[in-house]
């Protein structure tokens, strides 16, 4: 992880290697903490695959420094940056415009500098949808259970709303679940809430999506998949460990399982395509990401 000064020195060297200062596009991710981020791995692998004059760094930015960081990135000539916790909502006042996806999600994970204006976008939900579509069709026939009603669940539910899939929200705090249902309905989607862990709805589900951060240890996860039909798709947005206890239970019950690595991949791919207005080298980015996680 570079400091800004180290980045400036690196930028000059990189620019010269491509024929002159000013030819390189610069991107980054900001958050706190940020050392664990794998975004630079996949983005830089993509630039290398296409021989693009671009680079991607990660910068730790504390909440109190967010405003200065936004101004600094713009002043330093960055073409765009990703935003991760805890800044996805607090960055909104520093932006000039929001895309429909950002408005719908109420949060931003991608910023593009366009003729001096800062455009906020959200690729979390669309990244999840793109990864999900590799495993199932999305339309009004699908019954999808979403476990949780936090930020991740909101982004996913709002991205699924336009497909008219039947969403069932299950949350341990019913009030938050009801709030998410209302948001989906407000945007024209189909959703209702069921009691946390209600097996009857699990038996009907085509897909179950686990969006909470709990449950890395089986004894900590207050939910059972008992009653789910074999062959259903079960997704956990966590990707480390590769198979959470939740996914292990689903596999034992005969379900198809998917972790969150492709959600991470496709939110990055969608950010790339938003910034560069061109197709990203998905397989090169996927390979780099998988190698970074599995060695």
Where in this protein do the model-derived segments appear?
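Glycine-rich adenosine-cofactor-binding loop
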Residues: 31, 120-122, 132, 136, ...
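Phosphate/diphosphate ligand-binding glycine-rich loop within oxidoreductases
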Residues: 6-8, 13-137, 241-243
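Rossmann-fold NAD(P)-binding glycine/threonine-rich loop
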Residues: 232-282, 286-288
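NAD(P)-binding Rossmann-fold cofactor-contacting core
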Residues: 163-185
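Phosphate-coordination loops involved in phosphoryl transfer and adenosine-cofactor binding
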Residues: 24, 140-143, 230-231
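Rossmann-like adenosine-cofactor binding region
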Residues: 187-257
């Amino acid at each position: 992880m570079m400091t800004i000064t180290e980045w400036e020195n690196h930028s000059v060297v990189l620019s010269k290697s491509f024929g002159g200062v000013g030819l390189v596009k610069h991107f980054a991710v900001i958050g706190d903490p940020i050392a664990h981020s794998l975004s630079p791995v996949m983005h830089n692998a993509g630039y290398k695959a296409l021989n693009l004059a671009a680079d991607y760094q990660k910068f730790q930015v504390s909440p109190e420094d967010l405003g200065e960081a936004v101004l600094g990135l713009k002043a330093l000539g960055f073409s765009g940056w990703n935003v991760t916790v805890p800044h996805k909502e607090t960055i909104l006042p520093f932006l000039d415009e929001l895309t429909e996806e950002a408005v719908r999600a109420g949060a931003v994970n991608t910023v593009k500098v366009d003729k001096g204006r800062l455009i906020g976008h959200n690729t979390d939900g669309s990244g999840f949808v793109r990864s999900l579509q590799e495993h199932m069709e999305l339309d009004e026939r699908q019954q999808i259970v979403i476990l949780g009603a936090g930020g991740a669940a909101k982004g996913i539910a709002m991205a699924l709303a336009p497909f008219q899939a039947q969403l069932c929200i299950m949350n341990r705090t019913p009030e938050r679940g009801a709030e998410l249902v209302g948001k989906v309905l407000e945007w024209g989607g189909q959703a209702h809430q069921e009691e946390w862990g209600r097996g009857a709805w699990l038996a009907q589900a085509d897909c179950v999506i686990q969006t909470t951060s709990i449950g890395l240890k089986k004894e900590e996860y207050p939910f059972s998949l008992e009653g789910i039909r074999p062959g259903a798709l079960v997704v956990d947005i966590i990707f480390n460990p590769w198979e959470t206890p939740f996914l292990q239970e689903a596999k034992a019950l005969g379900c198809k399982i998917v972790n969150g690595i492709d959600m991470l991949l496709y939110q990055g791919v969608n950010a790339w395509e938003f910034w560069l207005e061109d197709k990203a080298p998905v397989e090169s980015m996927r390979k780099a990401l998988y190698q970074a996680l599995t060695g």
